Amino acid sequence: MILGNVCTRRCGFCAVQKGAPLAVDYDEPRRVAEACAALGLRYAVITSVNRDDRKDGGAELFALTIEAIRARISACKTEVLVPDFQGSHAAMEIVMNAHPHVLNHNIETVPRLYRQVRLGARYERSLDMLAHARRVRPEIPTKSGLMLGLGETLEEAIRVMRDLRAHGVGILTLGQYLRPSPKHLPILRYVPQQEFDELCDLGRGMGFTHVEAGPLVRSSYHASEAV
Protein backbone atom coordinates (compact mmCIF):
# COMPACT_ATOMS: atom_id res chain seq x y z
CA MET A 1 0.00 0.00 0.00
CA ILE A 2 1.43 3.32 -1.09
CA LEU A 3 0.62 6.96 -0.28
CA GLY A 4 0.66 6.42 3.48
CA ASN A 5 -1.66 4.66 5.89
CA VAL A 6 -4.20 7.43 6.56
CA CYS A 7 -7.29 7.62 4.34
CA THR A 8 -9.35 10.72 3.58
CA ARG A 9 -12.61 8.72 3.46
CA ARG A 10 -14.60 6.76 6.02
CA CYS A 11 -15.91 3.64 4.31
CA GLY A 12 -18.00 1.52 6.66
CA PHE A 13 -16.20 -1.75 5.86
CA CYS A 14 -12.58 -0.62 6.08
CA ALA A 15 -10.16 -0.72 9.02
CA VAL A 16 -7.61 1.71 7.57
CA GLN A 17 -6.94 4.77 9.74
CA LYS A 18 -8.94 7.87 8.77
CA GLY A 19 -7.90 11.51 8.98
CA ALA A 20 -5.45 13.99 7.49
CA PRO A 21 -2.68 12.13 5.64
CA LEU A 22 1.00 13.01 5.63
CA ALA A 23 2.81 14.53 2.66
CA VAL A 24 3.53 12.26 -0.30
CA ASP A 25 6.87 10.45 -0.03
CA TYR A 26 8.48 10.52 -3.47
CA ASP A 27 11.12 8.01 -2.43
CA GLU A 28 8.40 5.41 -1.89
CA PRO A 29 8.38 4.09 -5.50
CA ARG A 30 12.10 3.30 -5.26
CA ARG A 31 11.65 1.49 -1.95
CA VAL A 32 8.71 -0.51 -3.28
CA ALA A 33 10.75 -1.54 -6.31
CA GLU A 34 13.68 -2.54 -4.10
CA ALA A 35 11.33 -4.64 -1.95
CA CYS A 36 9.93 -6.37 -5.05
CA ALA A 37 13.47 -7.17 -6.19
CA ALA A 38 14.57 -8.39 -2.75
CA LEU A 39 11.57 -10.71 -2.58
CA GLY A 40 12.04 -11.93 -6.14
CA LEU A 41 8.46 -11.05 -7.03
CA ARG A 42 7.05 -11.85 -10.43
CA TYR A 43 3.71 -10.17 -9.73
CA ALA A 44 3.08 -7.15 -7.51
CA VAL A 45 -0.30 -5.71 -6.52
CA ILE A 46 -0.06 -2.03 -5.60
CA THR A 47 -2.89 -0.26 -3.79
CA SER A 48 -3.35 2.89 -1.74
CA VAL A 49 -5.55 4.83 0.60
CA ASN A 50 -7.82 7.50 -0.87
CA ARG A 51 -5.95 10.78 -1.21
CA ASP A 52 -8.72 13.30 -1.81
CA ASP A 53 -6.34 15.96 -0.47
CA ARG A 54 -4.38 15.78 -3.73
CA LYS A 55 -5.55 17.07 -7.09
CA ASP A 56 -4.54 13.86 -8.87
CA GLY A 57 -5.68 11.60 -6.02
CA GLY A 58 -2.22 10.06 -5.88
CA ALA A 59 -2.16 8.97 -9.53
CA GLU A 60 1.35 10.32 -10.08
CA LEU A 61 2.79 8.11 -7.34
CA PHE A 62 1.03 5.05 -8.78
CA ALA A 63 2.67 5.79 -12.14
CA LEU A 64 6.08 6.37 -10.59
CA THR A 65 5.81 3.10 -8.66
CA ILE A 66 4.88 1.11 -11.77
CA GLU A 67 7.82 2.64 -13.62
CA ALA A 68 10.23 2.05 -10.73
CA ILE A 69 9.30 -1.65 -10.51
CA ARG A 70 9.69 -2.06 -14.28
CA ALA A 71 13.12 -0.40 -14.19
CA ARG A 72 14.34 -2.43 -11.21
CA ILE A 73 12.88 -5.86 -11.98
CA SER A 74 11.51 -6.01 -15.52
CA ALA A 75 10.14 -9.55 -15.10
CA CYS A 76 7.72 -8.39 -12.39
CA LYS A 77 4.19 -7.68 -13.62
CA THR A 78 2.21 -4.94 -11.90
CA GLU A 79 -1.44 -4.77 -10.97
CA VAL A 80 -2.74 -1.51 -9.51
CA LEU A 81 -5.80 -1.34 -7.28
CA VAL A 82 -6.70 2.34 -7.48
CA PRO A 83 -9.26 4.61 -5.79
CA ASP A 84 -11.79 6.52 -7.88
CA PHE A 85 -9.61 9.67 -8.06
CA GLN A 86 -12.85 11.62 -7.46
CA GLY A 87 -13.81 10.88 -11.05
CA SER A 88 -10.77 12.55 -12.62
CA HIS A 89 -10.18 11.13 -16.09
CA ALA A 90 -6.83 12.91 -16.20
CA ALA A 91 -5.71 11.03 -13.08
CA MET A 92 -6.75 7.69 -14.55
CA GLU A 93 -4.84 8.54 -17.73
CA ILE A 94 -1.66 9.14 -15.70
CA VAL A 95 -1.92 5.62 -14.28
CA MET A 96 -2.87 3.90 -17.53
CA ASN A 97 -0.10 5.60 -19.48
CA ALA A 98 2.42 4.05 -17.07
CA HIS A 99 1.30 0.68 -18.52
CA PRO A 100 0.35 -1.52 -15.57
CA HIS A 101 -0.49 -5.09 -16.54
CA VAL A 102 -3.92 -4.89 -14.85
CA LEU A 103 -6.01 -1.93 -13.66
CA ASN A 104 -8.25 -2.80 -10.71
CA HIS A 105 -10.87 -0.56 -9.15
CA ASN A 106 -13.31 -2.25 -6.81
CA ILE A 107 -17.01 -1.48 -7.11
CA GLU A 108 -17.34 -3.08 -3.61
CA THR A 109 -21.13 -3.29 -3.26
CA VAL A 110 -24.49 -2.71 -4.94
CA PRO A 111 -25.67 0.86 -5.61
CA ARG A 112 -28.44 0.73 -2.98
CA LEU A 113 -25.86 0.26 -0.21
CA TYR A 114 -23.33 2.87 -1.29
CA ARG A 115 -24.24 5.43 1.37
CA GLN A 116 -23.56 2.98 4.18
CA VAL A 117 -20.64 1.11 2.62
CA ARG A 118 -18.73 3.60 0.44
CA LEU A 119 -19.25 7.04 1.92
CA GLY A 120 -17.89 9.64 -0.48
CA ALA A 121 -18.01 7.33 -3.50
CA ARG A 122 -20.59 7.01 -6.27
CA TYR A 123 -21.49 3.83 -8.12
CA GLU A 124 -21.83 5.48 -11.52
CA ARG A 125 -18.52 7.29 -11.05
CA SER A 126 -16.69 4.04 -10.37
CA LEU A 127 -18.20 2.46 -13.49
CA ASP A 128 -17.20 5.50 -15.52
CA MET A 129 -13.60 5.33 -14.29
CA LEU A 130 -13.35 1.65 -15.21
CA ALA A 131 -14.73 2.39 -18.67
CA HIS A 132 -12.34 5.30 -19.14
CA ALA A 133 -9.38 3.10 -18.27
CA ARG A 134 -10.36 0.84 -21.17
CA ARG A 135 -10.81 3.79 -23.52
CA VAL A 136 -7.31 5.05 -22.72
CA ARG A 137 -5.52 1.69 -22.96
CA PRO A 138 -7.87 -0.96 -24.39
CA GLU A 139 -5.05 -3.52 -24.39
CA ILE A 140 -4.81 -3.40 -20.57
CA PRO A 141 -7.41 -5.58 -18.79
CA THR A 142 -9.57 -4.05 -16.09
CA LYS A 143 -10.69 -5.77 -12.93
CA SER A 144 -13.21 -5.14 -10.16
CA GLY A 145 -14.52 -6.82 -7.05
CA LEU A 146 -17.64 -7.13 -4.97
CA MET A 147 -18.11 -7.97 -1.28
CA LEU A 148 -21.17 -10.05 -0.42
CA GLY A 149 -22.99 -10.33 2.88
CA LEU A 150 -23.72 -6.64 3.47
CA GLY A 151 -27.43 -6.87 2.76
CA GLU A 152 -27.49 -7.01 -1.02
CA THR A 153 -29.85 -9.38 -2.81
CA LEU A 154 -28.64 -11.98 -5.29
CA GLU A 155 -30.43 -10.11 -8.07
CA GLU A 156 -28.64 -6.87 -7.14
CA ALA A 157 -25.26 -8.59 -7.20
CA ILE A 158 -25.97 -10.05 -10.63
CA ARG A 159 -26.99 -6.61 -11.93
CA VAL A 160 -23.66 -5.20 -10.74
CA MET A 161 -21.83 -7.98 -12.57
CA ARG A 162 -23.71 -7.09 -15.75
CA ASP A 163 -22.90 -3.40 -15.28
CA LEU A 164 -19.21 -4.23 -14.90
CA ARG A 165 -19.20 -6.26 -18.12
CA ALA A 166 -21.05 -3.46 -19.92
CA HIS A 167 -18.24 -1.11 -18.88
CA GLY A 168 -15.49 -3.35 -20.21
CA VAL A 169 -14.37 -5.14 -17.04
CA GLY A 170 -12.90 -8.57 -17.77
CA ILE A 171 -11.64 -9.85 -14.40
CA LEU A 172 -13.94 -10.26 -11.39
CA THR A 173 -13.47 -11.12 -7.72
CA LEU A 174 -16.36 -12.01 -5.40
CA GLY A 175 -15.74 -12.47 -1.68
CA GLN A 176 -17.44 -12.56 1.70
CA TYR A 177 -17.48 -9.33 3.71
CA LEU A 178 -15.78 -9.90 7.06
CA ARG A 179 -16.18 -7.29 9.78
CA PRO A 180 -12.83 -5.77 10.87
CA SER A 181 -14.17 -4.74 14.30
CA PRO A 182 -17.45 -4.21 16.20
CA LYS A 183 -17.35 -0.56 15.06
CA HIS A 184 -17.68 -1.53 11.41
CA LEU A 185 -20.72 -2.57 9.39
CA PRO A 186 -22.24 -5.85 10.57
CA ILE A 187 -22.23 -9.04 8.53
CA LEU A 188 -25.83 -9.61 7.51
CA ARG A 189 -25.31 -12.95 5.79
CA TYR A 190 -22.67 -15.60 5.29
CA VAL A 191 -22.81 -16.57 1.63
CA PRO A 192 -22.47 -20.34 1.02
CA GLN A 193 -19.80 -21.64 -1.35
CA GLN A 194 -22.52 -23.03 -3.61
CA GLU A 195 -23.81 -19.51 -4.24
CA PHE A 196 -20.29 -18.28 -4.99
CA ASP A 197 -19.91 -21.15 -7.45
CA GLU A 198 -23.18 -20.23 -9.15
CA LEU A 199 -22.10 -16.59 -9.44
CA CYS A 200 -18.75 -17.71 -10.83
CA ASP A 201 -20.50 -19.72 -13.55
CA LEU A 202 -22.81 -16.78 -14.29
CA GLY A 203 -19.84 -14.45 -14.56
CA ARG A 204 -18.07 -16.68 -17.02
CA GLY A 205 -21.26 -16.88 -19.02
CA MET A 206 -21.41 -13.07 -19.11
CA GLY A 207 -17.96 -12.99 -20.68
CA PHE A 208 -15.59 -12.33 -17.78
CA THR A 209 -12.26 -13.87 -18.76
CA HIS A 210 -11.38 -14.74 -15.16
CA VAL A 211 -13.55 -15.03 -12.04
CA GLU A 212 -12.46 -15.78 -8.48
CA ALA A 213 -15.39 -16.40 -6.13
CA GLY A 214 -15.40 -17.68 -2.56
CA PRO A 215 -15.66 -16.60 1.08
CA LEU A 216 -11.94 -15.80 1.44
CA VAL A 217 -11.42 -14.26 -2.00
CA ARG A 218 -9.93 -10.76 -1.96
CA SER A 219 -8.66 -8.45 -4.70
CA SER A 220 -5.18 -9.96 -4.83
CA TYR A 221 -6.32 -13.60 -4.48
CA HIS A 222 -4.66 -15.64 -7.28
CA ALA A 223 -4.21 -12.30 -9.07
CA SER A 224 -1.34 -13.48 -11.25
CA GLU A 225 -3.45 -16.29 -12.71
CA ALA A 226 -5.74 -13.84 -14.50
CA VAL A 227 -3.05 -12.55 -16.90
Spans of model-derived segments:
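Canonical Radical SAM [4Fe-4S] cluster-binding loop centered on the CxxxCxxC motif
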Residues: 1-28
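Acidic/polar active-site rim loop that often engages polyanionic ligands
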Residues: 14, 42, 49
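Conserved alpha-helical substructure of the radical SAM core
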Residues: 18-45
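Auxiliary Fe-S-binding modules of radical SAM enzymes
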Residues: 30-40, 64-76, 96-98, 121-227
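Structural motif
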Residues: 35, 49, 79-83
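Hydrophobic residues within beta-strands of alpha/beta enzymes
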Residues: 44-46, 78, 103-105, 172, ...
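Conserved radical SAM core fold
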Residues: 45-55, 85-88, 101-123, 140-143, ...
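Distinct, well-ordered alpha-helical segments
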Residues: 57-60, 88-97
